[in-house]
Amino acid sequence: MDNNQDSQKKSKNLHKPAIVLSLFRFIFRNIGALFPSLVGRWAYHLWFKTHRSLRPRREEKWLQSATQIKAVEIRDEAFGDKALPVMTYYWENGSNLEAPLIMLIHGWTGRGSQMAAFAGPLLKAGFRVLSFDNHAHDQTPGNTTHIFKQSAVQRALAEKLGPIYGVVAHSFGGMITPYSLTHGMKTQKVVCISPPSHFDFLLARFSQTLHLPKSIQDYMVNRFKKEYGDNLIERVSSTNTSKELGHIPALIIHDEDDLDVLISESEQLHKAWPNSSMKRTTGLGHRRILYNPQVIEDTVDFLK
């Protein structure tokens, strides 16, 4: 394939998501109000759906230093009788097998390699590092998931490969982690980067993206409560779960220009988490913050 054909193919691939999103918006906006139950079931399914994207070259380079890349089987009632092979990325610290272990956890539609820029500096600071692809993300099987399954993976890995000295969590991983810590997982320090803190915020963002009418939003909330209990929102919102975590110091980092998760989400988490501090950045957005040298330095210094 010549360069022109390759460029045309890439251009078409880049436009596909935009075309699909426009189609979804048209359907939800024009048909959703007429058939809220039918279209609501579709929206409810999309809520749990994940999608995978190609790994950038910079992440491939970060992974080259990993000591071990392998699938680790975990078992939890969340996945029924079958073991789930979770892809893990592990960095040893020389011959020091007793070095404190830091767990990195990515966000929704993310991947373990996204967090790998932290590995080198953490190794230099005397830590070992574990990252992983959560359920239904990148190299770990599954097409749909939710916070309870993703928390089950985090807790199972911590039990199997731990103890975990500290956690560095990005985005949705920063909501999963407080939930995990109130359901048996143990650690000594936590860094949350660009985390959402309210279930309501996630639903509002989802609804805004797909142009969901209120009738569809109401259907989804009722379905959530029917499937997971009337107190679902309180159970998973980290402004609630973090209130129980005053014994664990936390650093919360968020960029003022983050358009995916508003900085107000971190500000409210900071207020709720008794033993937390917060740092603000500018101009980094939601993802570039993960490989900003100052953010990495602040994270490592906090974990020392």
Where are these regions (language model features)?
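Short alpha-helix in the alpha/beta-hydrolase fold that links the catalytic acid
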Residues: F118, L262-K271
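Alpha/beta-hydrolase active-site loop
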Residues: T144-Y165
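Gly/Ala-rich beta-loop-alpha elbow adjacent to hydrolase catalytic centers
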Residues: V168-T177
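Short beta-strand/loop motif that positions the catalytic acidic residue
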Residues: L245-G246, I252-H254, D258
